[in-house]
Amino acid sequence: MPLMSSSFTPGQAQATVNSFQDKGQRQIAQAELYYFSARAEECKDIAELYLQDKDIYLRLSAGLLYSFSNLTLGNPSAAKMGFRNIQECLHQTEQNPPSNEAMASCVFANYLAMVLMHLPTDKLPPLRDFLPYLPTGLRAYGIYVLAHNAYLHEEYANALGLCQSVFLMLDGCYPIAMEYLYCVIIMSLVNQKKENEARDVLMTAWNMAKADGFLEPFIEHHGLMLGQIEACIKPTEPELYKQLSQAVIAFSRGWMNIHNPKLQASVTDKLTPMEFAIAML
């Protein structure tokens, strides 16, 4: 994930993508930009080209981007194929690890896929052990994944502390990782009944994300923010909220197709984003 790994000023995502000299890294970085900008079709088209790449870092990145973009596009079988690709990378690397960095990237990708799908991670190597081998931007995002997992286990103070600690160690601005960290901070504060603080953080994250059009973090965490987007964004930016809402519906349906395959017609699948947010309160 070369773009996620990069430090850049908000608003400079495309320039950062263009700065990569290696063609593979540049194309995967472009796919990242498309994904985080909620342009799933364009992301998928690029990622598909690298699913069997010999470079394990490009292959892992492609697997993640291909899987999650296909969730939004309503292609669960394609999403599952991407996840299997990531698992195969880990199994191959465990048998003959080329480096600590490669192993760390495999563990990171698999842990990320499982946590964001709200699936158990007990059969994976512990991500914490491999964080030192990840580049700074990925390490920050890796801590977001750990914090998200803590949140799912209702460890809200732990999740909040993990996220806040990252901002103390960052040596630059890593917008993608920071926006996801902000999302867990918001979620944790809301569950601690600190809504005013949560809304302040939401506006900080939103203003950072808007500079590059990065709507995806808010799409993925919409329901877990328990109505904060409706409270803060809908009244002031109705057109962006409408765009966000449409993407939330698509992503949520795709997510449920993977997470809950036996409940294809679940109640939440039939709710609008605002109805779902109210139901979560």
Model features per residue range: what roles?
Residues 239-265:
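Intrinsically disordered or compositionally simple regulatory linkers and C-terminal tails
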Residues 13-23, 48-59, 84-101, 125-140, ...:
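Solenoid-like repeat scaffolds
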Residues 65, 75-78, 146-223:
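DNA-contacting interfaces and partner/effector-binding or oligomerization modules
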Residues 1-60, 211, 215, 221-242:
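Flexible inter-repeat linkers and adjacent short helices
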Residues 1-14, 32-49, 71-89, 112-127, ...:
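Helix-turn-helix repeat elements of alpha-solenoid scaffolds
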Residues 1-5, 24-39, 60-76, 102-118, ...:
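Tandem amphipathic alpha-helical repeat scaffolds
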Residues 84-88, 196-213, 234, 238-249:
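TPR/TPR-like (Sel1-like) alpha-helical repeat modules
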Residues 258-281:
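Helix-turn-helix DNA-binding segment
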